[in-house]
Amino acid sequence: MAEPGRPWAQARSAYRASEVLRRGTGRRRDPGPQSNGPGQEDARAPGRMARLRGQLRAEAASRSEVPRLLKLVERAGAGAAGRGREDRRAQPRAPCARYAGSPAAGPPTRRGSWRSASGGCRRAWRQCARSWAPGLRRCARSFERSWMPCARCCRRRRPRLPAASPAPSPAPRPAARPCRGRSAPLAPWSPPPGPQTTPRTAQQNAERTEPRPGRTTRRCQCRLGPRKVAGTEGGRTRAA
């Protein structure tokens, strides 16, 4: 739909140019001798880009945006046809447009393309920092020139503050209240009467681990390891 205040013909021309940029299809290459394919004469015929260029020139010959539209179409044709390796090497490389796997980052080194791309990024960053430094210095100088007079004026016109008074002395602590309980001092702690629980000695531990008289030290049969069974008598196993 055309924008308000814009002729429909201009919108149509711009739409066609944007379609060319979006699709990115250029002149078809020569398919070679084929039985059912197009022949040599069809391959030499003007391609789609040439026909579109002619239509744009014919439709927008009297409008002011003709050079811009033609430039868009030429750019689309160049991007669709693709540039050769020599053209890519000859064109100036954008310092901030390098990334891994891009032909603009240069040929990969023996250690891998990632190392080459990271080196290109570092060089691009240094170049950008060098280009930013003069502008930053100029901005700092202009800011200093505009700010320093204002600071001096404010320093001269600021009101005189009274001298700082000394810090107040802390309030005296209240006197300790007399004890309201019994006046006699508390007796020192003494252990309660009765047998005292002291830690067991090594001898007591040894006596505790010895078997008590009248009891067997034989462990439960279920806790014994596997034994060799020679036979079964009456449902009970007999050791060999």
UniProtKB/Swiss-Prot annotation:
Q: Where is this region: Disordered?
A: 1-117, 161-240
Question: Where is there biased composition of kind Pro residues?
Answer: 165-175
Q: Where is the composition biased (Low complexity)?
A: 176-187
Give the compositionally biased regions (Basic and acidic residues).
Answer: 19-31, 60-74
Q: Which residues form a coiled coil?
A: none
Record-stated family: Belongs to the FAM246 family.
- Stated name of the protein: Protein FAM246C
What is the scientific name of the source organism? Homo sapiens
